Swiss-Prot record:
It catalyses: D-fructose + ATP = D-fructose 6-phosphate + ADP + H(+). SUPFAM superfamilies: Ribokinase-like. It comes from Arabidopsis thaliana (Mouse-ear cress). This is Probable fructokinase-4. CDD domains: bac_FRK.
């Protein structure tokens, strides 16, 4: 399903883009942080840039505030080779901000400023349908499902992409502080579950969505549905597990000195989508899929070695050097 003009097919990422404020030192509370580094982020935007860094073709669809941060973020997308044609600017709401506490092990805790932020106010009639219809893969999360009108815009975009023949890719990217309750988060994340053909969840998200205290095959397969082509469970420093209709298995991690896990999952997803957009047969060939997932694990690992998501997303050459060294 390659693009007719010989260039790579388009992957469209839908959802939020925001500014993360990350403490200059790890292992302190937000109150005790001596200062913060401003880092662009937002999972769907991270995925789009991850794809572009690896040589893929990506576009982002979402809404930013018509403010300095919003225009800065749109500029960062363009600088990284991501099409910004699908971006709207809201004159009445600000670009979202998140303060991210880095624990000493590189894991994170979040405090969000979105009341409401521009991304929440994207309306169905503002969608750039031409961009969405051009997608061979349409990728999204669940944060855009939390409130209207963005929820309706999300559902419309999914429907349009699917009708145009796109592969639907879903990474729930659970951020509980943004939801009114745990129950609502679980309900809404699962409300669109059976639409996606590729789904990636973390081990923690797997336990949250199933109510299980185990991360095993039985728990993962309880989330399987008939439209799925690939279900992935990322295990952080333990690698990942994969499930298809015909086979299942696990791929070992790369061991690196993790500084900040922000964006690692997005980097993983970007690498996967980059490799399957023009070659969906990979999803039915276990040996080739394992190769792709090894590369995706390498991308995730490299991303943890620097602070912030977007600055840490690797290039193809960085990934190849890690692969060759292992």
């Amino acid at each position: 399903m390659a693009a007719s003009n010989g260039e790579k097919s388009l992957i469209v990422s839908f959802g939020e883009m925001l500014i993360d404020f990350v403490p200059t030192v790890s292992g302190v509370s937000l109150a005790d942080a001596p200062g913060f580094i401003k880092a662009p982020g937002g999972a769907p935007a991270n995925v789009a840039i991850a794809i572009s860094r690896l040589g893929g073709r990506a576009a982002f669809v979402g809404k930013l505030g018509d403010d300095e941060f919003g225009h800065m973020l749109a500029g960062i997308l363009k600088q990284n080779g991501v099409s910004a044609e699908g971006i709207n600017f809201d004159t009445g709401a600000r670009t979202a901000l998140a303060f991210v506490t880095l624990r000493s092990d590189g894991e994170r805790e979040f405090m969000f400023y979105r009341n409401p932020s521009a991304d929440m106010l994207l309306r169905p009639d503002e969608l750039n349908l031409d961009v969405i219809r051009s997608a061979k893969v349409f990728h999204y999360g669940s944060i855009s499902l939390i409130v209207e009108p963005c929820r309706s815009a999300h559902l419309k975009a999914m429907e349009v992409a699917k009708e145009a023949g796109a592969l639907l890719s879903y990474d729930p990217n659970l951020r509980l502080p943004l939801w009114p309750s745990k129950e609502e988060a679980q309900k809404q994340i699962l409300s669109i579950w059976d639409k996606a053909e590729v789904i990636k969840v973390s081990d923690e998200e797997l336990m949250f969505l199933t109510g299980s205290d185990k991360v095993d095959d039985e728990t993962a397969l309880s989330l399987w549905h008939s439209n799925l082509k690939l279900l992935l469970v990322t295990l952080g420093e333990k690698g990942c597990r994969y499930y298809t209709k015909s086979f299942r298995g696990s791929v070992d991690p790369f061991h690196v000195d993790a500084v900040d896990t922000t964006g690692a999952g997005d980097s993983f997803v970007g690498a996967l989508l980059c490799k399957i957009v023009d070659d969906r047969a990979v999803l039915e060939d276990e040996a080739r899929l394992r190769e792709v997932l090894r590369l995706a694990n390498a991308c995730g690992a490299i991303t943890t070695t620097k602070k912030g998501a977007i600055p840490a997303l690797p290039t193809e050459s960085e990934v190849q050097s890690l692969l060759k060294g292992n």
